[in-house]
């Protein structure tokens, strides 16, 4: 059985730099990230468990959104008119969020990003359950990070475990947790 070990969210409009300085403060690469990556990074920091920064092949990172990297794609498109910015280009793929989280935390399990037409708890739960079918995955950091602009976003994440403490990871509990 999969369980929700912990949950974190960041309300839309939150000053992400102030949040970073208050809660993390020791990862200068944060300032190069696009909004979606900053959100994913901060959610992962809130959900991180001990021990930190040790290789873990049993931890998957799965992120979902409707916007993908659209917010940063717009910034990159604007930069092309002057001079294309390599520092923006790297963030024009939705899976960069999972990569940033995995690199920071040394997670070596599956990393996947899914762009959906809309938030669909049934699909969310089914995809996360599928990740646990490999026999290696024991936990997953999974979330919804939808950055429509630098201050208009929806962001929440779960730490889901196989047979861990907490409530069952299913559609009903997903709805209940997100809508608290």
Feature map (PLM): residue ranges:
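Conserved "HGTGT" condensation-loop signature of ketosynthase/thiolase-family condensing enzymes
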Residues: 1-137, 141-180
């Amino acid at each position: 059985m999969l369980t929700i070990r912990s949950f974190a969210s960041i309300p839309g409009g939150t000053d992400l730099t102030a949040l970073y300085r208050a809660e993390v403060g020791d990862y200068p690469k944060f300032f190069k990230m696009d909004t979606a990556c900053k959100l994913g990074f901060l959610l992962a920091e809130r959900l991180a468990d001990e021990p930190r920064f040790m290789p873990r092949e049993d931890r998957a990172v799965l992120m979902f959104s409707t916007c993908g990297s659209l917010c940063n794609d717009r910034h990159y498109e604007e930069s092309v008119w002057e001079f294309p910015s390599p520092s923006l280009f790297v963030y024009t793929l939705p899976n960069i969020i999972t990569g940033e989280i995995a690199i920071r935390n040394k997670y070596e399990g599956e990393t996947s990003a899914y762009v959906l037409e809309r938030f669909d708890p049934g699909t969310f739960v089914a995809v996360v359950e599928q990740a646990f079918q490999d026999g290696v995955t024991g936990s997953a950091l999974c979330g919804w990070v939808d950055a429509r602009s630098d201050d208009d976003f929806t962001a929440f994440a779960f730490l889901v475990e196989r047979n861990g403490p907490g409530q069952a990871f299913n559609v009903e509990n997903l709805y209940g947790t997100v809508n608290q």
